[in-house]
Amino acid sequence: MALIVIVVLFSSCVSNRKISMMKKIIDEKKLIEKNLETKITTLNDFRINKSAIGELDDKSNESILKVLDTEKKGILQRTDSLNKMEAMLSGDKRIKIKEFKNIESIVATSNDIIAVKSESINFVDQLLKQQTFVKFNTAAFFNAGGFKIPEDKMDEAKIVFSPIVDSLIVFIKKFPKYKLNSSIIASGFADATGFSPGSLVDLLTSNMGKTEATKEELNSELSRLRAEEVSSILLTIYNERIKELANTGQFNTQFFKIGKGEEFPNKKIDNYQTDDERRRIVVIYWNALPE
C-alpha cells in the first residue's frame, strides 16, 4: 500500500531534468529582459541629450518618455514574475505537474509579449535616430517685428519647410502595420531685446487680452505668432502631400504652434546674449508614436 502511495506521489510531480531545463529557459528570458532594460536606459539617455540641445521638442520628449517608462515598468513586472517562478523551481518542495504546466504556459506566452515589446522599443530607437527637426533664423523669412511671411518669400519658405513634412511621411510609411499618432510642432524663440512703444506693442498686447505687457510677455507672443504662421504653411504642405497617397487612413497628424519667448533654444549653450540671432529662431519638429 505504501509503495502505491509513493508511486502516485512521484507520478504527480515533475522530474528534476524538466525542472532544470525550465530554469535554463527562465534564465534566458531574464537575460533578454535585462538587455531590453539596458536598451531603454540607453534610449532614455539619448532622449535627454536630444532634448537638452534642442533637437527634441517638449511634446515629443514627454511622449517618448511615457513609452519608455511604460516599457520599463513592464520589464520589471515580467522579471519579477520570472524570479518568483525560478524560486519555486529551486525550492525544496516538489513541483506538481499542474504547477509546472502553469509555469510552462506563462513562459510560452512571454515569447509573444517580448516580441511585441521589442518592436515597440526598436520603434522608439529608430524615431530617436531620425533628424526630426529643422531650424531657421527668423530674419530669413520675417521682417523685423513681423510675424507674417511676405508673399515674395513664400515659395522659398515652402522649399525650406517641405523636407520636414516629407521625412515624417516617409517614416510613417515604413511602418504600415502601425496606427500612428503623429505631430508637427512649430516652436518660436526670441531673444531678450526690448520693444519701442508703437503699433506692434499695441497689437501684441491686445492679442493677449491685456492693456499692458512685460517685455518677456511681448517676446513670447511674437514668437507664438511666428510659430503659428509657420504651422499654417506646414499644414498646407501636408494636405498637398496627403492627397498623393493611397492609404491616408494611416495618417493621424496634429499640428501645434508654441511660443517659447526668451527661453534658450539649446540648454547646453551658456553664452547666449540679450541681443542674439541664435535665439531668434523657429524650430519645426515632428514625431510619430503608436496609438
Question: Residues of each region from the PLM?
Answer:
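N-terminal targeting segments with Sec-dependent signals, encompassing both cleavable signal peptides
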Residues: 1-291
